[in-house]
Each structure stands twice: as structure tokens, then as C-alpha cells.
Swiss-Prot record:
Regulation acting on activity, per entry: Allosterically activated by HslU binding.
Gene3D superfamilies attached to this UniProt entry: Glutamine Phosphoribosylpyrophosphate, subunit 1, domain 1
Domain of life: Bacteria
Alphabetized GO MF terms: metal ion binding; threonine-type endopeptidase activity
Alphabetized Pfam families for the sequence: Proteasome
Swiss-Prot/TrEMBL catalytic activity: ATP-dependent cleavage of peptide bonds with broad specificity
Phylogenetic placement of the source organism: Bacteria, Pseudomonadati, Myxococcota, Myxococcia, Myxococcales
PANTHER family with a match to the protein in the record: ATP-DEPENDENT PROTEASE SUBUNIT HSLV, METALLOPROTEASE TLDD
Entry's Gene Ontology BP terms: proteolysis involved in protein catabolic process
PROSITE patterns in UniProt: PROTEASOME_BETA_2
Protein name per Swiss-Prot or TrEMBL: ATP-dependent protease subunit HslV
NCBIfam families: ATP_dep_HslV, PRK05456.1
Protein's organism: Anaeromyxobacter sp. (strain K)
Subunit and partners: A double ring-shaped homohexamer of HslV is capped on each side by a ring-shaped HslU homohexamer. The assembly of the HslU/HslV complex is dependent on binding of ATP.
Known role: Protease subunit of a proteasome-like degradation complex believed to be a general protein degrading machinery.
Amino acid sequence: MRPMHGTTVLCVRREGRVVIAGDGQVTLDKTVMKATARKVRRLGEGQVVAGFAGATADAFQLFELFEKKLKEHARSLPRAAVELAKQWRTDRMLRRLEALLLVADREHLLVLSGAGDVIEPDPVANGAAAAIGSGGPYALAAARALLAHSALDARQVAEEAMKLAAEICIYTNGNLTIEEL
């Protein structure tokens, strides 16, 4: 069985609010297997939001490891992210995991990969945004434009950007799960 793939997860920060949104579509090859998957969640006693793109089982394992790193490092998101990225890159079993994580608290927004990357995107006018997954580039472009040229709040920006991504990316649907800080 080939791994399931295709998703869009977008995180937007504006005026002290942080919103992460994930679509619900899970695709196996050319078939939609599920339309209501939950790809975003809260971690760190509710102070961190996180989403994943990639193999579902791998993502759940990474969520568990990241939760442990948050506890070990007193909920310091950057420190926990760097420690997870180091472990992910150097551990023989973890290196095989196929996923990307998007994590955020009120101050930081980070993308983590198995290559050891911990990327904090550049801020954009009136906020910050990052996206992962097959529809990520579409959602990110829309979010940046909305942040720069509208007065929409963080949730509205995320919803509109995800709507546009779902219209363009065949691996993304409009069944959103949204978490806010």
C-alpha cells in the first residue's frame, strides 16, 4: 500500500491571534479515502498549535515526540523544535518518517522537517504566515496577500486562504479543522 498524502495546513498570526487550519482530505493514489481527517491539534497544555502534512502514522509519532520535547524544555517552542529536528535527523528510525510539522505559539511560527530544518518564516505586513502540504503554496500566497491588503482578522485570513487553496489543489478540500490561540 502506498502512503497517503496530499494536504494543506496554514498558520496565520495577526494582532496577537494565532490560527492554524488544516483541510480534511486524505488521498491514497488517485482516490479520496477520507474527507474529514483532523490534521491540526493543540499541544503543550493548549499553548501550542500544530499541524502536519505527510504520512498520518508518522505525524502522530512526531506529535508525541514534540509534546515530550515541549515538556522537557519548559514549553519553549524554539528549543523544543530544534531538539526534535536534531533527533529526527539523526535517529535511524525517525529519519524514515515522511512528514512536515507546522507549529506555533503566540510568539513563534515554525516549520520542521526530517532533514533537520527549523524554519521561521519572514514576517509579512501586519502578521506572519506559513503553510505546508500540496496546497501550501496556494494558501500561503493568498494569506500573504490578505495580510498585506485587507483588515481581515487571523481566522478570516486563514479561512479565505484555505478556501482558495481548496479551489486550486486537487489534494485539498474545504472541510477545515481550525485551532486558535
